[in-house]
Each structure stands twice: as structure tokens, then as C-alpha cells.
């Protein structure tokens, strides 16, 4: 079997919420239940779990993936978490495909769930950031992307309205997504973008994402399980 013999056979997501009314474990359970319902697979058939990204909630511990498997009642032979920032979801797919290809599991559950806003337990008072990054203004991703964008501007030139087009297009997509955060389902224009507050020059407020709560997941498997393929658009 090769990597191309694997497929996403089911997808589920909660609504993105400014602040959730359920904790991270409840959201994770909702995703699992929806995927089982969509794909018709029995929970006992899931033998792989791959968690995406980092969480700042009660699920935040070095054994997040193992803890989640225990809470959800999953008995898996392959269990890990992928920390690659904003591309963690894609990393999960690659990791699950490789695990199935090498015979480490047959049916994988890919999951991210977070209630960072509901259960904000962030404490940076004793981290490296206070000494090594915050004095230079790198207080989160916007600062780092500001430096990268400035370097690009110096070397190649940068049309700020081009960046605005990205923000406007993404917002327009959110307007079409029923699961998008309601607070952000409001159209914006290029002028709105250009007039938004500068955060880390040239990164503006409307370039940034805000913290939000929610969960999403995939059921991933090889061709031998395609008899239980669910409709992704359900």
C-alpha cells in the first residue's frame, strides 16, 4: 500500500465560537460522535489517533493525545500529536497516511479541539518569551510575520492593498460558512483593511486571527475501508 491508497472518508466540525459553552472534552466527543454517525464505522474499529496543534486548555499536557484517547474511550495502537503551527491539520493527514502505510494502524481519527477562550490558563510569567522574545516586540505570531513581511517589502516591494485583498477574500469565505464565528461574519472592504490599526508593521489588525473555541476532525483510512466512506458534504 502507498500513501495515495489512503483517503479522508469523513469530516466533522463544530461552529467556531468566540467563547464556547462546552469544555474541550465535550467538543472532542461531539466530533467523534458525528464522524461515527457519518461513516458508519464502529468506535472499536478506530485504532489510530492523531491530534493537531497545541491547546491552552485543560487538555494541555505532554500526553494530550493519550489523555484524549482515554477520555473518548478509544483503544488505539498508534497515538500522537502534531505540532506544526497553522499547518498541523495537514501534518496530521500526512502522519496518519504514513502510519497506515507502515501498518501501525488501519483506521485513524484525526482531531483538534480547543476551548482556549473558555478556559484561559495561559501563564507566560515563567517562560522564555519574557526574556528572549517579548523585549524585541515578538509578542505572538503578528510580530514574527511583521518582520518577515518587512524583509519581503525591502527585497521585492509590497503592495499593501494586495495584502488587503487576502483579508477581504478570506472574510468573504467566512460569510459563506455557517460554522464561521458569528462575530466575524461581517463583510469588509479594502478601505476597511487599509484603515485598520497597525499591529506589527506592516501587519494590520485585519491581517490577524483572534483566539476562538471549536473542534474539527477527520476519519482517515485505507482503500480497504472505503465501503464505509461517508459524504464529506453531509
Language-model-derived ranges and their functions:
Residues 3-6, 47, 104-107:
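Loop/turn elements at helix/coil->beta-strand transitions in domains of secreted/extracellular proteins
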Residues 15-27, 52-56:
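A short N-terminal beta->alpha junction/helix N-cap motif
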Residues 21-39, 72:
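Short catalytic helix/loop segments, enriched in acidic residues and glycine
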Residues 41-43, 59-64, 74-234:
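Acyl-thioester C-C bond-transforming condensing/cleaving domain
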Residues 66, 70:
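Active-site phosphate/pyrophosphate- and oxyanion-stabilizing loops and adjacent acidic/basic residues
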Amino acid at each position: 500500500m502507498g500513501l495515495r491508497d489512503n483517503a479522508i472518508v469523513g469530516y466533522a466540525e463544530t461552529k467556531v465560537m468566540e467563547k464556547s459553552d462546552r469544555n474541550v472534552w465535550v467538543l472532542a466527543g461531539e466530533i467523534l460522535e458525528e464522524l461515527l454517525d457519518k461513516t458508519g464505522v464502529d468506535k472499536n474499529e478506530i485504532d489510530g489517533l492523531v491530534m493537531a496543534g497545541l491547546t491552552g486548555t485543560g487538555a494541555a499536557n505532554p500526553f494530550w493525545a493519550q489523555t484524549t484517547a482515554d477520555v473518548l474511550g478509544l483503544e488505539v495502537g498508534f497515538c500522537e500529536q502534531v505540532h506544526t503551527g497553522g499547518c498541523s491539520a495537514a501534518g496530521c493527514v500526512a502522519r496518519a497516511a504514513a502510519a497506515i502505510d507502515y501498518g501501525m494502524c488501519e483506521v485513524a481519527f484525526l482531531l483538534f479541539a480547543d476551548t482556549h477562550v473558555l478556559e484561559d490558563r495561559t501563564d507566560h510569567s515563567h517562560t522564555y518569551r519574557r526574556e528572549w522574545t517579548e523585549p524585541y516586540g515578538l509578542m505572538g505570531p503578528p510580530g514574527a510575520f511583521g518582520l518577515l513581511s518587512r524583509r519581503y517589502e525591502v527585497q521585492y516591494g509590497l503592495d499593501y492593498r494586495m495584502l488587503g485583498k487576502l483579508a477581504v477574500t478570506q472574510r468573504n469565505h467566512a460569510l459563506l460558512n455557517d460554522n464561521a464565528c458569528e462575530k466575524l461574519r461581517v463583510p469588509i472592504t479594502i478601505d476597511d483593511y487599509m484603515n485598520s490599526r497597525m499591529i506589527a508593521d506592516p501587519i494590520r489588525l485585519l491581517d490577524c486571527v483572534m483566539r476562538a473555541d471549536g473542534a474539527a476532525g477527520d476519519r482517515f483510512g485505507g482503500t480497504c475501508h472505503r465501503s464505509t466512506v461517508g459524504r464529506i458534504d453531509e
